[in-house]
Amino acid sequence: MKNIYTDLQKLMEQDNKKNSYVLLDENNGCVAGCRCGVSIYRLTEYGKVDAHEDQEGFFVISGKGMAKVGETEFEVHEGMAFLVPAGVWHTLCSCSDTEPLMVLWFHSAV
């Protein structure tokens, strides 16, 4: 049986310099492209833009920030969820130099 769980705290202790941690993927038994993880945005300027073949969902765990999805830019905050359609460029950043934006992201099975 595959390891069906992951501990974010342990991942962060192993490498606290990373900005993104995969929590669940094919190594945990996810199939057909299902993936889930946490990203931490510490910068107040947008970083790398991304686009994927599948849709990507986000849930803000903590902090405040900005999201740019295609041509739409909006503020995000704790408790907020949003969806990025397949093939659409997106990026996020924090609104604070002292409090990072932490989001859960997931890719659905295709």
Positions of PLM-derived features:
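Ligand-binding loop in jelly-roll beta-barrel domains
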Residues: A86-V110
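Short acidic-glycine-tyrosine-enriched beta hairpin
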Residues: E71-A86
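Short histidine-centered beta-strand/loop micro-motifs
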Residues: D25-E26, Y46-H52, C93-C95
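A short, N-terminal "cap"/entry segment at the start of jelly-roll beta-barrel domains
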Residues: M1-R35, K48
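Short strand-coil-strand connectors
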Residues: K68-T72, D97
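Short, conserved beta-strand element in jelly-roll/cupin
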Residues: I40-R42, A51-A67
